[in-house]
């Protein structure tokens, strides 16, 4: 085991030393959810979110990107403009922990080592896997968690980034995640309560969304890119 660890460390160091440009950094901002409880605004960050990201710049126009994110999400019928939701009065809080991989595409060429000020809009999509608390509505109309659960989502991100030095980038992005679950708010219980029709409420034919809005800061390392054909 020690031998393999040593070989892995040597190969990793050599790879990074002779690799094309990478970026590493973090993101911070707010999150909101869209579902069967509370407001239905698409962009309404009302809870804290923080994460990290890594990019492998394969050309001046695209990069492979991986990220992690932890976001609080919540909904409160009393803050909704929908009169029926206000009268119902449900509320909940949940925590989403995600891992995402995919491709980031810039509208214009973006050299992370440019000697002049540059900027570009960008798009990102891929596949997200996330963990959250499975929830249900108890008899007293209180929504509570009862187990851990996980699901997948499709991220759809629009952003704008600029260089702030020869190896540092600052960005702003809004990213919606379409999830393959309807239980972030407890409206459609999963796992052991999946067949409990009496616990369901809202539109059970529409899955939940959650949205991250915030800034990203990344730092480039590795040699200046030569950008191969791929």
Q: PLM features: what roles do these ranges have?
A:
Residues 18-57, 212-225, 230:
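Short glycine/proline- and aromatic-enriched beta-strand/turn motifs that initiate or cap beta-hairpins
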Residues 20, 44-48, 95-99, 119, ...:
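Residues that define the transmembrane beta-barrel architecture of outer-membrane proteins
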Residues 22, 61-64, 111, 167-170, ...:
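Repeated loop/turn-to-beta-strand initiation elements of outer-membrane beta-barrel proteins
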Residues 26, 30, 52-56, 101-105, ...:
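Residues on the lipid-exposed face of transmembrane beta-strands in outer-membrane beta-barrel proteins
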Residues 34-40, 84-92, 141-146, 200-203:
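Extracellular loop and loop/strand-boundary signature of outer-membrane beta-barrel proteins
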Residues 36-41, 77-83, 114-117, 134-141, ...:
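Outer-membrane beta-barrel translocator domains and adjoining extracellular loop/strand segments
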Residues 60-138, 221:
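Gram-negative (and chloroplast) outer-membrane scaffold detector with strong preference
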Residues 78, 165-230:
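Predominantly the C-terminal beta-signal and adjacent terminal strand-loop region
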């Amino acid at each position: 085991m020690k031998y393999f660890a040593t070989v892995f460390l040597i190969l990793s160091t050599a790879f990074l030393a002779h690799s094309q440009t990478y970026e590493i950094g973090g993101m911070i901002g707010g999150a909101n959810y869209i579902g069967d409880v509370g407001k239905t605004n698409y962009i309404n960050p009302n809870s804290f979110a923080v994460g990290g990201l890594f990019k492998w710049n394969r050309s001046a126009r695209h990069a492979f990107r991986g990220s992690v994110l932890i976001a609080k999400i919540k909904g409160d019928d009393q803050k909704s403009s929908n009169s029926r939701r206000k009268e119902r009065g449900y509320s909940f809080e949940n925590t989403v922990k995600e891992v995402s991989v995919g491709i980031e595409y810039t509208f214009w060429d973006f050299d992370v080592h440019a000697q002049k000020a540059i900027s570009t809009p960008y798009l990102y999509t891929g596949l997200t896997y996330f963990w959250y608390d499975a929830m249900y509505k108890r008899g007293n109309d209180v929504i509570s968690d009862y187990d851990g659960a996980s699901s997948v989502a499709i991220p759809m991100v629009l952003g704008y980034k600029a260089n702030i030095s020869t190896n540092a980038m600052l960005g702003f992005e809004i990213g919606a995640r379409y999830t393959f679950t309807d239980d972030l708010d407890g409206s459609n219980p999963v796992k052991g309560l999946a067949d409990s029709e009496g616990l369901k409420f809202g539109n059970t034919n529409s899955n939940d969304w959650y949205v991250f809005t915030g800034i990203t800061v990344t730092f480039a390392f590795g040699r200046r890119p030569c950008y191969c054909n791929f």
